[in-house]
Regions:
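Bacterial Sec-dependent N-terminal signal peptides
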Residues: 1-21
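Sequence signature of WD/YWTD-type beta-propeller architectures
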Residues: 20-294
């Protein structure tokens, strides 16, 4: 494992505003076995492992960050929009299939043994899902359903989804910046359930109240994740139409007033995933990095 230590001078120079949002202990490049190329890693709630798919191969893989042991947990699927249960025992993924030239999406749960269960049968309208503990909220054709994995009473929680380009909460369109000509992407709800972060195509990243009121411009951040209730982290990337030419991770306060660069442009850091203490990211070359926060 290679460590890149960030100097106090570099950290201070990368902060826009009057406060530092996070303190970085180290950035670790994870040594991967020959032939392994990571595509969008998702870090577990306790930060002990990541789940990823490979750039050139199918299936989902789990990597223990301490031992570096890698196991395939599913021969199918990719790492887009993965979610992991709070105890780390179940991974949730969307599965896409085609029939009669139509695309169908189902929701799968994969346990530590690799046993896969279908939570939502293939449908044309699986708009989104959320996970909290052992509870799963799904939005299918704008209908919200709560499921409990342990047989108990399912706990309701807000779930964000995109339908025909519009931002929805619990199946209801809120589209904080309006609907006409708008295309919303990458929605995510704050840990306390009071805010929603999203990307508005051609405009940038915003944070609004959960009812869609008071949208606040955050900046040009894509694929944002919540670091805590007051901070998001996303990627600021550029391309030449075919390949990524620069990409860095930036943490931002939800009022848009403070921003902190966590990596530099040349790092090509993309698609962050965080548990609040560690941030996993990958690069277009298939490298995997972990940012450890103090």
């Amino acid at each position: 494992m290679k460590k890149i230590f960030i100097s106090a001078m570099l950290l201070c120079s990368s902060v826009l505003g009057f406060a530092q949002l996070v303190e970085i202990q180290s950035i670790d490049k994870i040594d991967l076995p020959e032939g392994v190329s990571v595509n969008q890693a998702t870090i577990s709630p306790d930060g002990s492992f990541v789940v990823f798919s490979q750039n050139a191969k199918g299936g989902l893989h789990k990597m223990d960050l301490a031992s570096k042991e890698i196991n395939m947990i599913s021969a199918n699927g990719n790492s887009f929009d993965l979610k992991i249960a709070a105890d780390g025992t179940v991974v949730f993924r969307e599965s896409r299939t085609a029939e009669n030239k139509l695309r169908y999406t189902s929701l799968k749960a994969v346990d530590a043994r690799g046993v896969e269960t279908t939570l939502v049968a293939p449908t044309r309208d699986l708009n989104g899902f959320a996970v909290n503990g052992t509870n799963v909220m799904t939005v299918d054709n704008n209908k919200v359903e709560a499921k409990s994995l342990n047989g108990g009473v399912a706990v309701q929680m807000p779930v964000a989804s995109i339908r025909y380009g519009q931002l929805c909460i619990d199946g209801k369109v809120i589209s904080p910046n309006g609907q006409e000509g708008a295309s919303y992407l990458w929605p995510s709800i704050s840990p306390n359930g009071t805010k929603v972060c999203y990307y508005l195509a051609t405009k940038g990243c915003y944070v609004a109240n959960i009812d869609g009121s008071n949208p606040v411009y955050i900046g040009q951040l894509r694929a944002t994740k919540w670091l805590d209730d007051l901070t998001v982290v996303g990627m600021n990337d550029l391309d030449d139409g075919s390949v990524v030419t620069s990409s860095k991770l930036i943490a931002a306060s939800i009022d848009g007033q403070v921003k902190q660069e966590l990596t530099v442009d040349e790092s090509l850091a993309m698609f962050p995933s965080t548990n609040g203490k560690r941030i996993a990211y990958s690069t277009p070359m298939g490298d995997l990095f972990i940012i450890n926060l103090k």
